[in-house]
Amino acid sequence: MSPNPTRGSMEQAFSGRAAEPPTMAALKARETKFLREHELCRLATASKDAKPHVVPVIYTLDGGDVVVAVDYKTRKLKNLRENPRVALVVDEYRPNRGLMLEGDCEIIERGPEYLRLLKILFERFEFYRKNPWGEGESPILKIRPTKAVMW
């Protein structure tokens, strides 16, 4: 067994196969505060053959989960269908502060949970309120952190 349950081999991290079932990392108050102060992160996904892909996305929080809306025809969504493991970074150049999260992503496309998360996104982002969508039009990613590193 690995000494740190959130760590595994690089192959396991990119293959979507965990050595052990990941556990949710409870975000500390300062990590949650930092995330709430920002709205843009860089989301990293990897395909089933471990080809990495990183893109900027806007996000909001739902408790300890990170919530992101995506389009259907994106590489990140294709990757997530093959491999639910993600990493994301929120950072500031000056002062040099940041937060890196690793976690597992659930793709939500319909149903009560979708509508609940959609409401949270609409409340946070005026752009989404002005350009609304509904079930089946744009998947929502719910990312459950399993590791957090702040600097």
Please place each PLM-identified region on the residue numbering:
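Short, conserved active-site entrance elements at the starts or edges of catalytic domains
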Residues: 13-45
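Alpha-helix boundary recognition
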Residues: 35-36, 81-82, 122
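Short secondary-structure boundary/capping segments
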Residues: 32-33, 58, 78, 131-133
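Generic structural signal for secondary-structure transition and capping sites
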Residues: 39-40, 85, 126, 148
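Short secondary-structure boundary segments
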Residues: 72, 91-93, 145
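Short, surface-exposed beta-strand-loop junctions and turns on beta-sheet-rich folds
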Residues: 74-76
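Charged, gly/pro-rich active-site loop segments
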Residues: 2-26, 95-151
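Short beta-strand segments
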Residues: 38-71, 80, 87-90, 100
